[in-house]
């Protein structure tokens, strides 16, 4: 097989080639003919025995030769120079430009025929020249670069050859380039004569010349696949298709073909141009020429690839969205698979984030995320690129939003470079934030009243006069994305750097806290909490802000409710000031009284968790309102003496005193009604005072934003101590003041949790049960997310006995792969009967009863039909009588239902009629997939409300997850990898402890094993694991529990 | 199907069941048309037979106003009457073709004769006289509706003058029941069982046709009479003899249908009378009757809701009477209610899921709202005595869903209604239903004050959705605030003596204060201010009392007895205040109705 006809044609020039080299060359030929790659040990392992024996000798030879060559590079150079000059003389008349532009004529969809133009002349020239010794075209392996590497190895023997960096080197390069061209021509000729004679090839060639576009493309593909070096013209033709400005349909087809070809052609390293090669030391023998050929080819390929990338970039900016998408995909594809031109590719990919079309922009986002998943090392580079993209002038908000969104989705870890990356990210975020705010400033300066639609929410601006104006949608979204990003990245910043960030950024965050948008506020509070928990400095200001946030009606309506509750829990648990915790608890209870059941449950559960870590709070439940003074209470209320209105309680004394005091307050505030100016002044003065205390510069804002002006007034009056005769006893007797702005001064620790009394009468059974549980002095045990489980939709789903369709979670971030799995865990319909009544969750009890009735009634009716003996009837009657008085007895229903089966049907039928069959249609109407599709589209729409919510929730979930991680870390576990298992252990222990445990209606762990396994895999990759839903759901609870 | 070939027809019969069914349905109509026309043109037994046959088919889908239904019973009538005819005197021979009522050429029934008949029946329970009387009664009932004299050429009953006419009817209606009973030897209070036992009584066999005839004629009268007083009187008298209907299930069904129809469509008194009948029926007879009453009424009620009517004040009566009926057998109604509420929930779910216009419209339809209204009232009427917890829970959830389905000032009325319901449920059941946030959200409606004062009252709108231009009116804003105050007042009034009232009211008061600051309308500000003051004084009061207590929150019993004494006397200023607001709201509602 290795019958290389070595020296027949190159006899004159290479007389120095000896027979041993010929044999060596043949052995190399053998190696190169092997399909396997590279000049590595596989070559030694793989071939059959005979070959290895054969090889051993050449190996030695090679070593010899290497030694030889080592000795004589200089002389070689000298020789070469001479040769080069000779060669140059030979090609003297060929213009240099020609070589620089290997493709002068962009022949569209045709190989440039050798019969045209000066190229032909050149080739004619080449024809006239003697043939140089060269590797045979037919011997090319499937990966040319392996062959090239082999030749390199052969020529230089694996030494590193420094590239000469002289000026005159260029000249050498030019010469060699010409030589390379000649060699390539010769090579192509060789290919044409050897292989091109085959029938297949002929057909292919004819297809190239006269075929449909598809044919031509395929033909080109085949040619290039056959031997890329010899068929560079085919490659050029394909490139021409793509770069051509004329036909986009060619571009469509060409892009795919070309990208496939190029993926095959490109090595895993970067391509080198001729300039980077040690051309001056290349020997002028067959190997040398062959190597030169390969180098030249590589150079050509590099140029072509560059053109291809340029073309890609261009078509990614095309008008046609399809072409754009295709180009984008190809860019991503090329970028992930090959490193050549990665910079350019990356730039154009990042650039697509600014695409005016949301779809393309989010595609770019998606591709970038995937890219980082494939090549985590590229994070820094990509972030830099996005950074420079972000701060381009005149960049639209939308583009910024997409960019920030992408950045915030980057996965981070504590290992390696990631802390630095995180730091970098945070810098970017804050820099962007600054830009946004200054822009807003400028805009506001430009036109005072207008710019409402584009206004960035800048608390500084909105503070005074426009504080009621809600920041515009887009704006809050980008802010929210920014904050999400910061929240995510912050935990990964190394500690010392974190301090700097805190130092510089806290004021900004506090401004954000008071943004009119609740979500923004919560997220910044979240971040503040994170910061402060890291530093162990929990500022009063933070708590005050949080406390006031509780009052906002949107607190529970927003998509961030879950996050907010999580934040509250953490804040309350970490708080050392028990009075403040008490104040928070009271207010949480009051909020629970106002909100829909699921939030009430959330609040109660939150309190239960707080109670676990703050057992002293129990006394607010189980003890009467504390009247005895505690030593750490401020003593201002002890000062004044008062007449005993209620003399029966001895400890009441000082409270009564305060009552007197408060009478004055009441009175004065009543007076204040008439003279509101006066009050206003007082209020402002007071707020000033308070500002002094708390050094809070945004105090005024709080005052405006939260309905606490009244309270301020009262306090101010209090301070005035305008004592007046007690008209009537006032509330707030020395103790709890629900309206105080500063939670630690509310004296909430003296108030009992009377709210539980009302809550235990709540219409929703779960709320009632939870409140009852707390009242009985035990902790609530609940494995679920009340916000989801008890929501109205969940209720309706259960009511309809409908297992919600399992919707596939598409898109989404990698951090949060899925969150909708939990629906499948529900016990639906008659399945609920498998549980004992005691195990059924309170909110499901209704259904349980319902099905119990249903089951027994059907049984009974059957029985009845079967045999209707008089005794039985009598017994039934008796039964009936018994039921008459016992309302609790559900068998009575059964009895009735037994007779009513048909009636039920009738009613149902009738109702159906009445409803115009609306109900019947429901099967068709609940296409969740469709809905999802819509939602997905919305997701990409920056303006859409819905997507906002969706996106936000994703992030929430994730954030909570994150927190969990962080907390475990903070607790000193340190090792993130163990988080999961730790959590699980804790959970199982907790489970055992459960008193009122409900038998889990959820599927067993085994069913989710595959998911968990998946997680583990992911864990190994990154520290931050994306927990699958079932664990996650519990985990969320857990996060509340454990924090 | 007429044009199809034989094979095609065969195929259709085999495979297109629905077509077959429809054609079956259509046929009687067509035939009936012919029949009626024929009836007019050619009298005769032949024709009669034909008429008799069709009704059997028609029985499947009998309708109220369908004359063909009469024919069904007409056939039986003939039998009965023929029996009686044999006893009648020679008046039968007289045939008069002219039916002009004023001329009355054939004086078949004279005043004097009637008097004697009545006398005989009244005093001696003389059966032949009764038979004759019933024949006349029948004729009177059918008067003007039956082509008299033609259908039965050999017998013809006519009535002398309007006085006689009235007397026949009145006498029969008044005395029939008593007469039947005395003939059968029953007391006035005999039960259904006794009636059923009559089967073995030989007297019954002879009397049965008479009773049947009486009912049939009466039903006809009720259905056809134009005069409200007659109907009303008839219904009243009919009530007494309802027990006899146990023997005639068909007639019973018919009566139910008629009564339901009257109940829904009739005037106030008739409606009431009809309801009383229905109630009696459901009380006297077995559960099946109760069900059919309930279902029919329910259906009719909901159907009625769709029809925009001028007198919408009757709807509460309908609802209340239906509730009353349901309350008779709570357990049975319970299952009906749960089925119905499931339907409501289904619709709600659909609306929530799709948010498309039709689904939402469905929620806002009068039908849906009235259905909710019905069950809310049912539950609140019975929740004290029975365990309706599941129903309560589900309906509260549904109402909450409806209230939050579409948020916006345009749906203010619906929301107010929802909160009313919740308040109602909460008050009657004693459970806590959080409404404050729902109410207070109404304060946030962004309305402008620049709109000129609108003349119309909001309540004039029958639709749930308000027209857009109203939203800007000052009137609307006032209405918003007044509703808020009213709803909150109801809510607070319920809990005003509860130990956790101070905490309950804290946040609403805060939000109201905020609104008070923000608002620019002086009139509204004053109202709000006053409300805040009252609530605060209430808070203080409870707080003061609470400070004295010695028990802890987990002592539920003590907490429940807390301030029970104070609750009894409604002299507390804020209680009076709440009451005044509620009364005022009621007053304005009433005023608006008028």
From Swiss-Prot, chain A:
**Keyword entries, A-Z:** Nucleus
Q: Which SUPFAM superfamilies match?
A: ARM repeat
* Chief place where the protein resides: nucleus
Q: Which GO terms describe its cellular component?
A: nucleolus
Summarize what gene deletion causes: Female gametophyte mutant with impaired progression of the mitotic cycles and lost synchrony of female gametophyte development leading to an arrest of female gametophytes at the two-, four-, or eight-nucleate stage and characterized by unfused polar nuclei. Defective pollen development.
Per the record, the GO terms for biological process are:
embryo sac development; polar nucleus fusion; pollen development; regulation of cell division
Protein localization: Nucleus; Nucleus, Nucleolus
This protein's source sits in the domain of life called: Eukaryota
Ranges of Basic residues compositional bias?
47-59, 988-1000, 1032-1043
Q: Which family does it belong to?
A: Belongs to the CBF/MAK21 family.
Name listed for the protein in its UniProt record: Protein SLOW WALKER 2
Q: Which gene encodes it?
A: SWA2
From Swiss-Prot, chain B:
A Gene Ontology annotation in the biological process aspect, one of them, is: floral meristem determinacy
Domain of life of the native organism = Eukaryota
Protein name, as recorded: Protein REBELOTE
Extra remark beyond the main annotation: 'Rebelote' means once again in French.
Per the record, which residues fall in region Disordered?
A: 1-21, 35-58
Instruction: Give the matching InterPro entries.
Output: Noc2
* Listed result of changing residue 8 to T: In rbl-1; indeterminate flowers in crc-1 background
Name the keywords, alphabetized: Nucleus
The Basic and acidic residues compositionally biased stretches are 36-58
The terms describing its cellular component in GO are:
nucleolus; nucleoplasm; nucleus
Tissues of expression: Expressed at low levels in roots, shoots, leaves, stems, inflorescences, flowers and siliques, with highest levels dividing tissues.
Q: Per the UniProt entry, what species is this protein from, by scientific name?
A: Arabidopsis thaliana (Mouse-ear cress)
| General function of this protein | Collaboratively with CYP40/SQN and ULT1, influences floral meristem (FM) determinacy in an AGAMOUS and SUPERMAN-dependent manner, thus contributing to the floral developmental homeostasis.
Q: How does it associate, per the subunit comment?
A: Interacts with SWA2, NOC2 and NOC3 in both the nucleolus and nucleoplasm. Binds to ENAP1 and OBE1.
| Basic residues compositional bias, start-end | 1-13
List where in the cell it is found: Nucleus; Nucleus, Nucleolus; Nucleus, Nucleoplasm
State the span of motif (Nuclear localization signal 2): 35-42
Return the motif ranges for Nuclear localization signal 3. Answer: 512-519
Position of motif Nuclear localization signal 1?
A: 8-15
Give the family per the record: Belongs to the NOC2 family.
The UniProt entry, under PANTHER family, shows:
NUCLEOLAR COMPLEX 2 AND RAD4-RELATED (PTHR12687), PROTEIN REBELOTE (PTHR12687:SF8)
Phenotype when inactivated? Answer: Plants lacking both CRC and RBL exhibit strong floral meristem (FM) indeterminacy with reiterations of extra floral whorls in the center of the flower associated with reduced AGAMOUS and SUPERMAN levels.
